[in-house]
């Protein structure tokens, strides 16, 4: 290839390049970066991260040597021309993180994807002292760390189908997604899938302790609880995906009248297990609403 042709090719690559900025480089951002890089290898993507913690920045650079790290907000200029910006800081740090970046022009054209808990699309615009921004709000969960997330997505009225597809492709790189029609549903998603892994871990803890109390050592009890939960979840997924049994039908198939499973489930039912789960989810939803005020 001649020098002029090479220059033209480089310019075209730069024009077609998807330029992504992460503001914040914590665990969820790390999971997303890893998923995007692993699943979008054929695409021309450049990822930069603004991370003020030197420890976190060094960890990110070691894990992903191909990304660019900014340690200070004033290192970022309009020349960077980001077209997708992930907000990935703690809620209490968002206003301070955005304040020095308000003056930059790319906010008006970029797709903003926020994984900041409790921060509405309107609040984000207020922090940026701007209006009519394209914002997709996301509630992922920690299984994103192994590309098994369940994420709820809401797009404000300024987001067109092209940008919705872009957000969908990026978030699908770390798991499953569900589009929401109402921003208030983010609070419900937070209660079910956002906090849901903790409910599963709590049940695993309880099952492990029950096994230990029956004479199994710690590692044996851990294996029994974990493989039982994993196997049951995969069996349920197989059935749901193939249109066979639902959760209730699967439970009923394990439960013989007058048998051991029936005896255990009877204790759950008598102690209002389903009601307890619902109350716990409602408490999480209400707390999410409060954090968003």
Per-range role (PLM):
Residues 1-75, 79-80, 148-149, 212-213:
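NAD(P)+-binding Rossmann beta1-loop-alpha1 motif at the extreme N-terminus of oxidoreductases
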Residues 47, 57, 217-225, 250:
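Small-residue helix-packing motif on alpha-helices
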Residues 2, 226, 230-293:
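NAD(P)-dependent Rossmann-like dehydrogenase/reductase catalytic/cofactor-binding core
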């Amino acid at each position: 290839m001649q020098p002029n042709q090479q220059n033209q090719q480089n310019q075209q690559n730069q024009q077609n390049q998807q330029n992504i900025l992460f503001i914040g480089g914590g665990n969820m951002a790390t999971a997303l970066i890893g998923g995007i890089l692993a699943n979008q290898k054929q695409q021309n993507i450049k990822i930069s991260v603004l991370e003020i913690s030197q420890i976190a920045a060094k960890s990110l650079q070691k894990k992903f040597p191909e990304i660019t790290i900014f340690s200070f907000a004033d290192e970022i200029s309009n020349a960077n021309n980001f077209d997708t910006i992930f907000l990935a800081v703690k809620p209490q740090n968002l206003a301070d993180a955005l304040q020095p970046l308000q003056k930059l022009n790319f906010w008006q054209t970029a797709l903003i994807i926020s994984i900041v808990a409790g921060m509405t699309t309107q609040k984000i615009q207020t922090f940026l002292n701007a209006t009519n921004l394209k914002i997709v709000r996301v509630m992922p969960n920690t299984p994103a760390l192994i590309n098994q997330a369940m994420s709820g997505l809401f797009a404000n009225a300024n987001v067109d189908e092209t940008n919705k597809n872009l957000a969908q492709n990026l978030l699908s790189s770390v798991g499953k997604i569900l589009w929401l029609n109402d921003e208030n549903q983010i609070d419900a998603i937070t209660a079910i899938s956002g906090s849901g892994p903790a409910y599963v871990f709590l049940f695993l803890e309880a099952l492990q302790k029950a096994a230990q109390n029956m004479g199994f050592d710690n590692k044996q009890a851990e294996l029994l609880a974990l493989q039982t939960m994993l196997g049951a979840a995969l069996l349920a997924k197989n059935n749901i995906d193939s249109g066979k049994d639902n959760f209730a039908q699967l439970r009923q198939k394990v439960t013989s009248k007058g048998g051991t499973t029936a005896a255990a489930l009877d204790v759950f039912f008598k102690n209002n297990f389903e009601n307890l789960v619902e109350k716990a989810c409602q408490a999480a939803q209400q707390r999410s609403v409060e954090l968003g005020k």
